[in-house]
Regions:
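A short glycine-rich, Lys/Arg-flanked "PGG" loop and its adjoining helix->strand segment in the class I
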Residues: 126-138
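Class I SAM-dependent methyltransferase SAM/SAH-binding core
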Residues: 51, 57-100
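Short alpha-helix
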Residues: 168-183
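A short SAM/SAH-binding and catalytic strip from SAM-dependent methyltransferases
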Residues: 110-124
Length: 213
């Protein structure tokens, strides 16, 4: 079932059409967020449950699974879901819209959203993050990597690895930090950075579900 909103439908179709190109381009976990990944892993107990939210071709799903974590991966793209089911057969992989997570409360120790949350409009981000908070256990970890812009805005731009245009939300760092805190998270790390050879400024946020709800 395709997304009803035309912009989100365009995002879904863009990744379906470019899934093989994207998967070939990004075969391994992004090295430019390895620092964040190591911090995320260091705080997770052995055997933790992780939701890879917007898993793409599954490079992080595979890494977490290899490390012994119990991984559930979701994506809006049918093609990515097919690819990841083959790539990581011991992970649970579902087609799902991250704006409407169909999981019980407190199901996961960690939620990983690497360059996926950027496809959610600012007007819907608070509700989406509240959904993330709901499926995390108390103290559960949250990570997101996003596009950083000169202002917070919804734009159409070219996706690396596919050379296809679709919609992304660019963020001012202070704006997204405020929204993350407003959704019940404590931020432990927030950094602007740029990928070598990349075309966009980026940012990452690492935090955990606060007990001050």
């Amino acid at each position: 079932m395709k997304a009803e909103d035309p912009d989100y439908r365009h995002i879904e179709e863009t990744y379906d059409e470019g899934s093989q190109d994207y998967g070939d381009y990004f075969k391994n976990p992004h090295e430019f967020i390895e620092k964040d990944r190591q911090q995320f892993i260091a705080r997770l107990p052995a055997g933790s449950t992780i939701l890879d939210c917007g898993c793409g071709p599954g490079m992080d799903t595979e890494r977490f699974s290899q490390l012994g974590y119990k991984v559930t991966a979701i994506d809006l793209s049918d093609r990515f879901v097919e690819l990841v089911r083959k790539r990581v057969p011991n992970a649970r992989v579902e087609k799902m819209d991250m704006r409407n997570l169909a999981f019980p409360k407190a199901a996961f120790n960690g939620l990983w959203a690497s360059f996926s949350l950027l496809h959610i409009r600012a007007s819907e981000i608070q509700e989406t993050l509240s959904g993330f908070n709901s499926v995390l256990r108390d103290g559960g970890l949250f990570f997101a990597a996003l596009h950083r812009g000169p202002k917070t805005r919804w734009v159409k731009t070219t996706i690396s690895g596919m050379e296809r245009d679709t919609y992304v939300q660019e963020w001012l760092q202070t704006d997204i930090e405020a929204v993350v805190r407003g959704a019940g998270f404590e931020i432990t790390g927030s950094r602007p950075f740029e990928r070598t050879g990349g075309r966009y400024p980026l940012l990452s946020i690492l935090g955990y579900k606060s007990d001050r709800q």
